[in-house]
From Swiss-Prot:
<dbReference type="GO" id="GO:0009734">
    <property type="term" value="P:auxin-activated signaling pathway"/>
</dbReference>
<comment type="subunit">
    <text>Homodimers and heterodimers. Interacts with TPL.</text>
</comment>
<dbReference type="Pfam" id="PF02309">
    <property type="entry name" value="AUX_IAA"/>
</dbReference>
<comment type="function">
    <text>Aux/IAA proteins are short-lived transcriptional factors that function as repressors of early auxin response genes at low auxin concentrations. Repression is thought to result from the interaction with auxin response factors (ARFs), proteins that bind to the auxin-responsive promoter element (AuxRE). Formation of heterodimers with ARF proteins may alter their ability to modulate early auxin response genes expression.</text>
</comment>
<dbReference type="InterPro" id="IPR033389">
    <property type="entry name" value="AUX/IAA_dom"/>
</dbReference>
<feature type="region of interest" description="Disordered">
    <location>
        <begin position="1"/>
        <end position="39"/>
    </location>
</feature>
<dbReference type="InterPro" id="IPR003311">
    <property type="entry name" value="AUX_IAA"/>
</dbReference>
<feature type="domain" description="PB1">
    <location>
        <begin position="80"/>
        <end position="161"/>
    </location>
</feature>
<feature type="compositionally biased region" description="Polar residues">
    <location>
        <begin position="17"/>
        <end position="39"/>
    </location>
</feature>
<keyword id="KW-0539">Nucleus</keyword>
<comment type="similarity">
    <text>Belongs to the Aux/IAA family.</text>
</comment>
<dbReference type="GO" id="GO:0009733">
    <property type="term" value="P:response to auxin"/>
</dbReference>
<dbReference type="GO" id="GO:0010102">
    <property type="term" value="P:lateral root morphogenesis"/>
</dbReference>
<keyword id="KW-0805">Transcription regulation</keyword>
<dbReference type="GO" id="GO:0042802">
    <property type="term" value="F:identical protein binding"/>
</dbReference>
<dbReference type="GO" id="GO:0005634">
    <property type="term" value="C:nucleus"/>
</dbReference>
<protein>
    <recommendedName>
        <fullName>Auxin-responsive protein IAA28</fullName>
    </recommendedName>
</protein>
């Protein structure tokens, strides 16, 4: 009989010593006043819980802080604008953070250092910087204001000057 009481399934937390006596009819009798006083003396006031499984307020505060930190990281990452850059004749492309530069001169100097060779493309003007915008058009770097360039650039290309000028639209017809 004692073993059956221990194995009885109840809908109460494990800390409660809640026992009931069964009648012959199977109906439950009220527990004694000793048991209820035992329960009320041992009950500890806890903060209200939310959801299932219960989540305490300290956990909720922790998750709220983590969410704020993640949003801050995402906003910092959005400030960094990485763009792929490929040089004609070089099989491996690189990435450049455009937010690290303030104008075209700084960008061209960085690209010059990135693809440095014996003959620098900046000094000899054998190479020209071209960018691909959001519409897929290839435009010479420096044709538009810097802010517009940063907002529309999708990819940078370093092309030979002869190839870069063949990209410009040709006029068909008499003028």
């Amino acid at each position: 009989m004692e073993e059956e009481k221990r194995l009885e399934l109840r809908l109460a937390p494990p800390c409660h010593q809640f026992t009931s006596n069964n009648n012959i009819n199977g109906s439950k009798q009220k527990s004694s006043t000793k048991e209820t006083s035992f329960l009320s003396n041992n009950r500890v006031e806890v903060a209200p819980v939310v959801g299932w499984p219960p989540v305490r307020s300290s956990r909720r505060n922790l998750t709220a802080q983590l969410k704020e930190e993640m949003k801050k990281k995402e906003s910092d990452e959005e400030k960094e604008l990485y763009v792929k850059i490929n040089m004609e004749g070089v099989p491996i492309g690189r990435k450049v953070n455009l937010s690290a530069y303030n104008n075209y001169q700084q960008l061209s100097h960085a690209v010059d250092q990135l693809f440095s060779k014996k003959d620098s493309w900046d000094l000899n003007r054998q190479y020209t910087l071209v960018y691909e915008d959001t519409e897929g058009d290839k435009v010479l770097v420096g044709d538009v204001p810097w802010e517009m360039f940063v907002s529309t650039v999708k990819r940078l290309h370093v092309l030979k000057t002869s190839h870069a000028f063949s990209l410009s639209p040709r006029k068909h017809g008499k003028e």
